[in-house]
From Swiss-Prot:
Cofactor descriptive note: Binds 2 heme b groups non-covalently.
Co-factor requirement: heme b
Pfam families xrefs: Cytochrom_B_C (PF00032), Cytochrome_B (PF00033)
UniProt: heme b b566 binding residues: H97, H196
Superkingdom classification of source: Eukaryota
Binding residues annotated for heme b b562, in chain numbering: H83, H182
Main function: Component of the ubiquinol-cytochrome c reductase complex (complex III or cytochrome b-c1 complex) that is part of the mitochondrial respiratory chain. The b-c1 complex mediates electron transfer from ubiquinol to cytochrome c. Contributes to the generation of a proton gradient across the mitochondrial membrane that is then used for ATP synthesis.
Membrane-topology descriptor: Multi-pass membrane protein
Protein's recorded name: Cytochrome b
Cellular component terms per the entry's GO annotation: mitochondrial inner membrane; respiratory chain complex III
Binding site for a ubiquinone: H201
Biological process according to GO: mitochondrial electron transport, ubiquinol to cytochrome c
InterPro entries tied to this protein: Cyt_b/b6_C (IPR005798), Cyt_b/b6_C_sf (IPR036150), Cyt_b/b6_N (IPR005797), Cytb/b6-like_sf (IPR027387), Cytochrome_b (IPR030689), Cytochrome_b_C_euk/bac (IPR048260), Cytochrome_b_N_euk/bac (IPR048259), Di-haem_cyt_TM (IPR016174)
Length: 379
């Protein structure tokens, strides 16, 4: 009798994806973040579902309903803070996952990579709309500022913004539709994740050396299942430390003030995971230019397969590229810091320099260094 695991139409798919999947024998802990992102997505969908049972998407009651969840619902505070901080963990894992892809040249699987970039956009859109739902000051003004950016689009801008708002300002219609989109997007993300995995399993995983590893594969289970479980335990440990000891560490105190269209907060800023893009947006004095730079700061990831000039796939044996990669990481930290600072000297000029450096490293310096390293191979 053949194993049901290998014959049953549905279980067979799971078997080929998570059990008998041939995986490189040398993939490091940097390859754990895919599974961690899956766990983050599951946590977010489950906690979000339970929050949606008690939340009301109406301007009059939204803020009160969140307070009600935290005070009156059994373990409501836990569900709410797991959802809020789960988003932060999601983005930490996302940034590390993308960084791993850049460092080890995983972007040469360009279908997998491009679906990944679309996923990044989808998660960012979901997180932005989720931030609006508690209807605090920063929710309202964040929504106003970010949606307003679309008015920079020539000809259709103003009409587009009013269409998204469902009126002439961010109001009840906006909140209701943001809740609807925030609910549906994670399921679209789940479908995209399946496509992401489908393309990945067509080629198999990359590995730290960047070399073809077909001659040295091991089964995913038990080797990488146990490794992923360790990663998951560490993720949940960090998340629960954050949730139970300092749940508001990454939030904005302004969001504990109900939304007031007549009172603008002194510093409007998004959640920490958008600050790098926000800094790039603010560093350009022109509105349309800023919006383009904001979109390109993420969209530029799609250019990496084209900009790859090196004869080697991974950066493992390319010290000059490694050095530039870590300068890029430091630059992103700088942009994140600048995004949270007021628009005044010296932060403006630092932000502008960091933004220029960001695009320069990706578009010019890294490809140039790769070509130079190719020359070094001949010496």
């Amino acid at each position: 009798m053949t194993n049901i695991r290998k014959t049953h139409p549905l279980i067979k798919i799971i078997n080929h994806s998570f059990i008998d999947l041939p995986a490189p024998s040398n993939i490091s802990a940097w390859w754990n973040f895919g599974s961690l992102l899956g766990i983050c997505l599951i946590i977010q969908i489950l906690t979000g579902l339970f929050l949606a049972m008690h939340y009301t998407s109406d301007t009059m009651t939204a803020f009160s309903s969140v307070t009600h969840i935290c005070r009156d619902v059994n373990y409501g505070w836990l569900i709410r803070y797991m959802h809020a901080n789960g988003a932060s963990m999601f983005f930490i894992c996302l940034f590390l996952h993308v960084g791993r892809g850049l460092y080890y040249g995983s972007y040469t699987y360009f279908e997998t990579w491009n679906i990944g970039v679309i996923l990044l956009f989808a998660v960012m859109a979901t997180a932005f709309m989720g931030y609006v739902l508690p209807w605090g000051q920063m929710s309202f003004w964040g929504a106003t500022v970010i949606t307003n950016l679309l008015s920079a689009i020539p000809y259709i801008g103003t009409t587009l913004v009013e269409w998204i708002w469902g009126g002439f300002s961010v109001d009840k219609a906006t909140l209701t539709r943001f809740f609807a989109f925030h609910f549906i997007l994670p399921f679209i993300i789940t479908a995209l994740v399946m496509v992401h995995l489908l393309f990945l399993h067509e080629t198999g995983s990359n590995n730290p050396s960047g070399l073809i590893s077909d001659s040295d594969k091991i089964p995913f289970h038990p080797y990488y299942t146990i490794k992923d479980i360790l990663g998951a335990l560490l993720l949940i440990l960090i998340l629960m430390i954050l949730v139970l000891f300092s749940p508001d560490l990454l939030g904005d105190p302004d969001n504990y003030t109900p939304a007031n269209p007549l009172n603008t907060p002194p510093h409007i800023k998004p959640e920490w995971y958008f600050l790098f893009a926000y800094a790039i947006l603010r560093s350009i004095p022109n509105k349309l230019g800023g919006v383009l730079a904001l979109v390109l700061s993420i969209l530029i990831l799609m250019l990496f397969p084209i900009l790859h000039m090196s004869k080697q796939r991974s950066m493992m044996f390319r010290p000059l590229s490694q050095c530039m990669f870590w300068i890029l990481v430091a630059d992103l930290f700088t942009l994140t810091w600048i995004g949270g600072q007021p628009v005044e000297y010296p932060f403006i000029i630092i932000g502008q320099l960091a933004s220029i450096l960001y695009f320069m490293i990706i578009l010019v310096i890294l490809p140039a260094i790769s070509l130079f390293e190719n020359k070094l191979l001949k010496w």
